């Protein structure tokens, strides 16, 4: 068992170690860690972002990291990372991270703390459950190879034309449809203009891959794509957000938008498409199953209530 030290808000001295940990976890687990909004928080010092806590060995090797983020609807969110070659010590590392996080949050009073565990890491989940957390949500990443076959049985025969998103013009209409379509969703349903503009400032943002459907001059649906590592052999396309207006969209528009997004990614030589979906969203899961998507991995959220300070 190694001696562990917790460091709040890691300084520039430890930042390379945090980044190395992230790269190691991504290489071991095969997908990106720290969701996009957490990276944006860190880059922009977002007011909703609290801070990060690292766990180090005596030689300053970073073996664990947690990013804390205040969510106005869901208490405090944590995302925990444990170094792949130290996961046999997950109980100790996670315990140190949660203890430090709890101490830093005591002044907030009783709060629910939500911990995201990427790729359903069994060691990390066991460690959290041992501390009293319980699983309450799971998000699946689905993937399928590209291109979608021209004669694929799920490909719609007749689809309307789509246009691309116009930055500076389409934000209000898009926010209205997005928030109405995702009113039920814990993360996607309450975006505001700054949330959208922060995405537009990201290096990956490309309005050419942000497709809009209109009917009688009104926005009724969209498919927003994203490309990870676009110039590498591991390039991965993502259907980042897709939705139709629940009040106005014609039947079948969702399938047409999905195909348009897949075709856009394939046209740019992306070999694989991915998307995220709640494991309880049976309607969406049935749609993606028809198009040949399969589960790549599952991210799990666990919850624990921070007690009142004594």
Swiss-Prot record:
Gene3D superfamilies: 3.40.630.30. InterPro entries: Acyl_CoA_acyltransferase, GNAT_dom, MshD_Acetyltransferase, Mycothiol_AcTrfase. One of its GO terms (molecular function) is protein-N-terminal-alanine acetyltransferase activity. Acetyl-CoA 2 binds at residues 242-244, 281-286. Residues 5-155, 160-309 form the N-acetyltransferase domain. Acetyl-CoA 1 binds at residues 80-82. Its EC number is 2.3.1.189. Keywords: Acyltransferase, Repeat, Transferase. Catalyzes the transfer of acetyl from acetyl-CoA to desacetylmycothiol (Cys-GlcN-Ins) to form mycothiol. Belongs to the acetyltransferase family. MshD subfamily. This is Mycothiol acetyltransferase. The lineage of its organism: Bacteria, Bacillati, Actinomycetota, Acidimicrobiia, Acidimicrobiales.
């Amino acid at each position: 068992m190694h001696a562990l030290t917790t460091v709040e808000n890691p300084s520039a001295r430890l930042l390379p170690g945090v980044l190395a940990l992230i790269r190691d976890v991504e290489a071991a687990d095969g997908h990106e860690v720290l969701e996009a909004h957490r990276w944006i928080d860190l880059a922009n010092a977002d007011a909703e972002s609290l801070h990060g806590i690292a766990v180090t060995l005596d030689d300053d090797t970073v073996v664990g990291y947690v990013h804390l983020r205040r969510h106005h609807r869901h208490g405090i969110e944590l995302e925990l990372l444990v170094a792949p070659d130290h996961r046999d010590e997950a109980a100790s590392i996670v315990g140190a991270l949660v203890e430090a996080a709890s101490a830093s949050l005591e002044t907030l009073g009783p709060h629910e703390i939500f911990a995201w565990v990427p790729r359903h890491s069994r060691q990390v989940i066991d460690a959290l459950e041992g501390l009293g957390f319980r699983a309450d949500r799971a998000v699946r990443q689905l993937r399928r190879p590209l291109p979608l076959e021209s004669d694929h049985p799920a490909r719609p025969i007749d689809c309307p034309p789509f246009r691309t998103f116009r930055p500076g013009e389409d934000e209000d209409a898009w926010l209205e449809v997005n928030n109405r379509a995702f009113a039920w969703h814990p993360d996607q349903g309450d975006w505001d203009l700054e949330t959208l503009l922060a995405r537009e400032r990201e290096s990956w943002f490309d309005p050419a891959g942000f497709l809009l459907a209109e009917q009688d001059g009104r926005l009724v649906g969209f498919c927003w794509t994203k490309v990870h590592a676009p110039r590498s052999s591991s390039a991965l396309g993502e259907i980042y957000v897709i939705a139709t207006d629940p009040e106005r969209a014609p039947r079948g528009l969702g399938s047409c938008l999905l195909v348009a997004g897949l075709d856009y990614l394939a046209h740019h030589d992306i070999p694989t498409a991915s998307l995220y979906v709640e494991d309880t969203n049976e309607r969406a899961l049935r749609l993606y199953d028809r198009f040949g998507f399969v589960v790549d991995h599952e991210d799990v959220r666990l919850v624990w209530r921070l007690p009142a300070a004594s």
